[in-house]
Amino acid sequence: MVLAELGGSISRALQQMSNATIIDEKVLNECLNEITRALLQADVQFKLVRDMTTNIKKIVNLDDLAAGHNKRRIIQQAVFNELCKILDPGKPSFTPKKGKPSIVMFVGLQGSGKTTTCTKYAYYHQKKGWKPALVCADTFRAGAFDQLKQNATKAKIPFYGSYTESDPVKIAVDGVETFKKENCDLIIVDTSGRHKQEAALFEEMRQVAEATKPDLVIFVMDSSIGQAAFDQAQAFKQSVAVGAVIVTKMDGHAKGGGALSAVAATKSPVIFIGTGEHMDEFEVFDVKPFVSRLLGMGDWSGFMDKIHEVVPMDQQPELLQKLSEGHFTLRIMYEQFQNILKMGPIGQVFSMLPGFSAELMPKGRENESQAKIKRYMTMMDSMTNEELDSSNPKLMTDSRIMRIARGSGRQVHEVMDMMEEYKRLAKIWSKMKGLKIPKKGEMSALSRNMNAQHMSKVLPPQMLKQIGGMGGLQNLMKQMGSAKDMMGGMGGMFGGGDK
């Protein structure tokens, strides 16, 4: 994912500081210098970086800290909070309401992925029960209407545009009026992409905004734009009332620091990020979990939300029961592999787990991991019900393994590798035995600590250290929020554990 290199550099700087015997002014300055260098290399604006390090030094006054304070944790928390502050201007964005027509206007640079993002935004809300519609007011780019028409047709979203009308203001007004009559409650207007220096296109954008009176103007920004991001974003903010930002191409290899700068320039929150070309590669942006994932600290709440999306409600109680019993079969492993594949790109899923930073799951390895899961599932398709439902690995004799290999078209050693993976996951699952899962909204401090103790047995030592020991794990447990009752989904999906 984009910004992965930045996250890795900051994580390493914090890790080096954590490994120091004594935390003094010299160690703190070395850590901040490394973080500063990483941010500047990632194209974050100099003033933002300077202000961030100044604020951290004000917060972390080593001379004023009492002997009992954990200096490492205070520094780590200060870095975390300052990164969150860069990405969060502190003001909420407009939220459309179902049943009441809302007009959302999209603006952005040429090539930022604006038209595709319009459709993703519409598709996301359509799945949540809105009745969206798309209006193509981009008369500048050849093929713009064709692209929007193709995307909208694929997503089954109504659209409006014209091959003959050249006035974008008229198209926008007519489209909005048409969809208001059809009782659409989310009308999305796509405008022409532009550059900062194109005065005529900016004037056109202002006219479209004045005529349609949008409830929200969204600035779409390509994460790879680099140093120019701040100036470009500011130019849009000065022309129209930008109220939110969507950052695209977050799956690329670009530095991506410009994304941080754009938020500062527009003083508007990031509401979504685009993580790929497909319609479902579009995530709601939440600052703290994002920074947590960026630094390799995981995002439990996001992970649990993913589980909520893919595990059918009728299967959830059964899964929790099996978890509390520590009973793990090949069938359960198969079902959890299915859930992982439904969650989306596997690297995205693993980045939500503490210790699985983008460096530990590099981009080239994501497809390999996904392919391995699919191979395992193919082998399990050749198993009998008795084999799938047994929790006794000794049942898998040599003759059974050879039969499964032949039936699935795989090698014997591949089936044996799969069985080793099963044993490893079964070992993790067994450690979850007896885990008490409180009902929604009933996570007391005591039960959270008990769950953290169980989790500390499951996590590999290296991962537990990276989170910040038991204290850090307890903090992560707090993040789980309303998704705590779904913690059982973790058992079969976890990629870590003792070999």
Curated annotation (Swiss-Prot):
UniProt-listed GO biological process terms: SRP-dependent cotranslational protein targeting to membrane, translocation
Presence of keyword GTP-binding: yes
Reactions accelerated catalytically: GTP + H2O = GDP + phosphate + H(+)
Superkingdom of this protein's organism: Eukaryota
Enzyme Commission number(s) from the entry: 3.6.5.4
Full protein name: Signal recognition particle subunit SRP54 2
Stretches for region G-domain: 1-295
InterPro entries the record matches: AAA+_ATPase, P-loop_NTPase, Signal_recog_part_SRP54_M_sf, Signal_recog_particl_SRP54_hlx, Signal_recog_particle_SRP54_M, SRP/SRP_N, SRP54, SRP54_euk
Example of a GO MF term: GTPase activity
Cellular localisation: Cytoplasm; Endoplasmic reticulum
Residue sites binding GTP per the record: 108-115, 190-194, 248-251
Subunit structure: Component of a signal recognition particle (SRP) complex that consists of a 7SL RNA molecule of 300 nucleotides and six protein subunits: SRP72, SRP68, SRP54, SRP19, SRP14 and SRP9.
Function: Component of the signal recognition particle (SRP) complex, a ribonucleoprotein complex that mediates the cotranslational targeting of secretory and membrane proteins to the endoplasmic reticulum (ER). As part of the SRP complex, associates with the SRP receptor (SR) component SRPRA to target secretory proteins to the endoplasmic reticulum membrane. Binds to the signal sequence of presecretory proteins when they emerge from the ribosomes. Displays basal GTPase activity, and stimulates reciprocal GTPase activation of the SR subunit SRPRA.
GO CC term, one of those recorded: signal recognition particle, endoplasmic reticulum targeting
Alphabetical list of CDD domains matching this protein: SRP54_G
Protein family per UniProt: Belongs to the GTP-binding SRP family. SRP54 subfamily.
Keywords: Cytoplasm, Endoplasmic reticulum, GTP-binding, Hydrolase, Nucleotide-binding, Ribonucleoprotein, RNA-binding, Signal recognition particle
Entry domain remark: The NG domain, also named G domain, is a special guanosine triphosphatase (GTPase) domain, which binds GTP and forms a guanosine 5'-triphosphate (GTP)-dependent complex with a homologous NG domain in the SRP receptor subunit SRPRA. The two NG domains undergo cooperative rearrangements upon their assembly, which culminate in the reciprocal activation of the GTPase activity of one another. SRP receptor compaction upon binding with cargo-loaded SRP and GTPase rearrangement drive SRP-mediated cotranslational protein translocation into the ER. The M domain binds the 7SL RNA in presence of SRP19 and binds the signal sequence of presecretory proteins.
Organism annotation: Solanum lycopersicum
Residue segments, region M-domain: 296-499
